[in-house]
Amino acid sequence: AMLDIGEASELDITEKDFDFVYNINVKGAFYGLKYVMPIMKQQKAGSIVNTASVAGLIGSPNMMLYNSSKHALMGINKVAALEAAPFNVRVNTVNPGVINTQMMRNIESKVAPGAAEAAQAAYNDAVPMKRYGEPEEVANVITFLLSDEATYVSSSSFTIDGALYNV
């Protein structure tokens, strides 16, 4: 989840902000794994896909909480995948980049108050494919990872960002 706490340097982050972001992005995934993994292990089958972000692969100024929480989620998934593999349970991560969602509308408005269209144009220009991804494009990757077509895919991270991460 991209959380609405605004951008802040590490010196301005409060404990309340820290807890808010980590409770959702890290604890939420942790508890999901904690309570579903035993069932999947017992069934000797299952697939879990958690959504991190391109932000979990990089660092961004004034985005310490969001970026670091997504890094943490990716680490949790790596360990969970190793622990679940002997039980035929798969754990993977998707890392969306700039996706055409309400979250991006909020970011555009914050980055360029009163000029959201200019912000959107700048984001489009930054992406090598010159466009935002669509939610369905992320959903298609998740659908594949959850399907029987991906039974040997685990501990993997899939970046869906129009090659932005390579820039």
What feature does the model see in each segment?
Residues A8, I13, G59-N67, V79, ...:
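Active-site loop-to-helix junction immediately N-terminal to the catalytic Tyr of the SDR YXXXK motif
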Residues L11-F30, V49, L73, M129:
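Catalytic Tyr-X3-Lys loop
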Residues P38, L82-E83, T151:
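Alpha-helical segment proximal to the catalytic Tyr-Lys
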Residues G6-E10, T14-D19, A119, Y123:
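Substrate-binding pocket helix/loop in short-chain dehydrogenase/reductase
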Residues I58, T143, S154-V167:
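Short C-terminal tail/terminal secondary-structure segment
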Residues A85, R90, V153-S155:
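Short, small/polar-rich loop/turn modules that mediate ligand/substrate recognition or access, typified
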